[in-house]
Amino acid sequence: MRFTRIAIRNFKPYEDAELDLRDGVTVIHGVNGSGKSSLLEACFFALYGSKALAGTLEDVVTTGADDAEITLEFVHDGGEYRIDRRVRVSGDRATTAKCVLDGPEGTVEGARDVRRHVASLLRMDAEAFVNCAYVQQGEVNKLINATPSQRQDMIDDLLQLGKLETYRERAGNARLGVEDVLTKKRSVLEDVESQIEAKEDADLHATLNALESELDSLDEEISNYESQRDKAKSALDAAEATLDEHAEKRERLDEIESAIEDLTAKISADETKRDDLSERVRELDAAADELESDIDDALARADLDDASDEAIADAREALSARESELRDDLSEARTRAQAFETQAERLRERADDLESRAEEKREAAEVDAETAAEAERELESFRETRAELRSALDDAEARFEDAPVELGEAADLLEERREARSEARESLAETETELKNARERLAEAERLRDAGKCPECGQPVEGSPHVDAISEREAAVESLEADRESLESAVESRSAAVEAAEALVEVETRASSRRDRLDLVDERIADREETVESRREAAEEKREAAAELDSEAEEKREAATTQAERAEEVAETVDSLESDLDTLDDRRDRLDRVESLVDTRAEKIDARDRLREKRETLAEVNRERREHLRERRERRDELRETVDEEAVEGAKQRKKNAAAYLERVEDEVLPELREKRDDLQSRVGGVEAELEQLDDLRERRDHLAERVDALESVHDEVSTLESTYGDLRAELRQRNVEVLERMLNETFDLVYANDAYSRIRLDGEYGLTVFQKDGTALEPEQLSGGERALFNLSLRCAIYRLLAEGIDGAAPLPPLILDEPTVFLDGGHVSRLVDLVEDMQSRGVKQILIVSHDEDLVGAADDLVRVEKNPTTNRSTVERTDAPIVEGALADD
């Protein structure tokens, strides 16, 4: 894997930066704090998002910006990839607004999905990336300072041996699960076998035979009673049939008599209706004659010769033609009148609009004039403020003429003096502590002397004062008191110097603030001068425009008056045409009257004819009804002769006897017998169910036995798998330890050839031991700071080589990234680091990125990148440059 391009906007100190990254060794060079590490952090953040941050998302967005954008392009395993991320700040919270990964496999969107895809591509998450390829600033001793177990976890994760441990744990969990299931199945099997034994002891087959024999006898008795019941039902049915037949004949007789009465009533009612219809026919004849007279009068008023349909249609056609002609003229006249009125209204509205616009122009001119006057007053005020600020700045510059530093350097002076005061205070505190201890020792010596004991050893002495030790301690106390007084004087002097520096910083701060205010006042003066001129010109232009609009409005009002007069003339023509149309409507109403009377007369005649037909129909219906009445009276007489009352009484007695027998058998005898049979059947069913349960239990026992055998086999297989994973992990770890130890010593020999150290031992638990030339074993913590740094870099490079050569033959690892690796190194050790970088490059590492402010690394670079920060804007910039240019720039610095 190789980075090819990084582009960032509003990322930490960068406002807008873009850098192409090439193969070989790239040194990113610049002074401390210029933003070099932020370039590498941008690459790391593009790959892993928030997991690559020590803080929060808000930390990556440039202060004062609303969002940040990062684009990283890289090649991996022959494919080209591009990641775009955008972080947006809303309020106090930052979120990922966009995260897209484009590659040969397609597009992946979303921060989590992109992070998972990157981890899958590189076969390492953010933590593994840092442990393998990215030596972050300040973390150069991370692997050395880690415990062996921590180091083991880091390296195992990188080599993916952690997966074997995960598989072993899964197999162990599976083994425990199988043991739980096996225990449960064995318990169930024992329970089933005890149930089978209990049922076999109950002799269920003999019990079933006895119950079935008793049940057959009871079924025979029930069958006999049911046969007698069926015979009684037959007798009951025959008696009921006789009674039903008699009832049916009686019902039919009643129906016929009812039908005779209905027919007689209907014949009488229809005869009454025929008389009423004859009266209504006579009334309709009289009404038709009266309508004939009304039609003659209407014809005379309508100026028609006859009331035929042709005459009425001709008259209507003539009226329609005249009406069409009048309406065309009326429509044309109305259109003209409306057009004149619309034109007049539009002209009046246009005049009103022009007058309104003229008034607005005049008001706007007044506003512009007032704005110009106000801006002129503000202009005078700003000029006075500028003079005051300029005077204050001159005073501040005069204050620094006698100061030990220039204006703008007071903060550095204050920091130096504060550090000096802190050092003096620390020395004073140490001296006071030593003085306190010396006084305590002197007091103890005097106490021992007074007690007749040696001040040195505390043993009793005889006659010897032994004052030498006491004199020395008194001299020490006096010396420390003198030192304390000197240090107190130094602290007081340095505190006064700090106060003086603080006063200068305050003056400098006020001067900076006034300089900013002066720039702002200059901008406002220029703005107000422009406002005065532009507003006065605008006011004059608007007054001229208002006069032109008033003149145009007067012309529009005169034109509106002319069009209104034309509209009134056309309106008179409209009134005349509407009067002619009203006359035509009167003639049409008279025609409608004639036509209505003719239609009414025709309706009366039609109604009369329908009533006559209905009267004849009723006469025919009554003739048919009288024939039906004669037939029903004959049928009634025949039915009266067929009814036998004695047969009916005999049938009633037989029905009563049969019903009494059926009631006793069905309500008492058969229910009791059936209840006994149901009880026996239930008992038989219970025994049969127990026999079926016995068969089921035997089948279940066989199945459980097979299941237990299978689980025992699975348990053995899972146990074997668990131990296999553990053995394989231990074997692979030992092989990796041996290879890693060899590679580590190869790298260490390169770094420390011909020096005091001979080799490094890496044990199976990843414990590290360094051996000197004389065979003395040392812990890594016993090395110097620079030696530990090179030792750690050697270990990092060895791990990188192991990953590159040991996973599937050759793994496309990310670039080797070193962020400020020289922080713990002196000049001699830096040259060893250069040798190490060249060795890694010679071993096939295609891309190495180094961030450093050290000039010694420039010579090892294939590609040089310079990072600078503008002290005014606090923004960083990046550019690629050639080595001679960089070295010259460094010399200038």
Curated annotation (Swiss-Prot):
ATP binds at K12, N32, G33, S34, G35, K36, S37, S38, Q137. Pfam families: AAA_23. GO terms for biological process: double-strand break repair. Residues 345-383, 397-436, 507-578, 621-655 are annotated as: Disordered. Its cofactor is Zn(2+). Residues 345-365, 374-383, 414-436, 507-546, 554-569, 621-642 have a biased composition (Basic and acidic residues). Binds 1 zinc ion per homodimer. Keywords: ATP-binding, Coiled coil, DNA damage, DNA repair, Hydrolase, Metal-binding, Nucleotide-binding, Zinc. Zn(2+) binds at C454, C457. The keyword Nucleotide-binding applies. Residues 404-506 form the Zinc-hook domain. GO terms for molecular function: ATP binding; ATP hydrolysis activity; zinc ion binding. Disruption phenotype: Mutants are more resistant to DNA damage, but recover more slowly than the wild-type. The keyword Hydrolase applies. Residues 198-451, 477-506, 564-594, 688-721 form a coiled coil. Homodimer. Forms a heterotetramer composed of two Mre11 subunits and two Rad50 subunits. Belongs to the SMC family. RAD50 subfamily. Part of the Rad50/Mre11 complex, which is involved in the early steps of DNA double-strand break (DSB) repair. Rad50 controls the balance between DNA end bridging and DNA resection via ATP-dependent structural rearrangements of the Rad50/Mre11 complex. In polyploid organisms, the Rad50/Mre11 complex appears to restrain the repair of double-strand breaks by homologous recombination, allowing another pathway to act as the primary mode of repair. The two conserved Cys that bind zinc constitute the zinc-hook, which separates the large intramolecular coiled coil regions. The 2 Cys residues coordinate one molecule of zinc with the help of the 2 Cys residues of the zinc-hook of another Rad50 molecule, thereby forming a V-shaped homodimer. This is DNA double-strand break repair Rad50 ATPase.
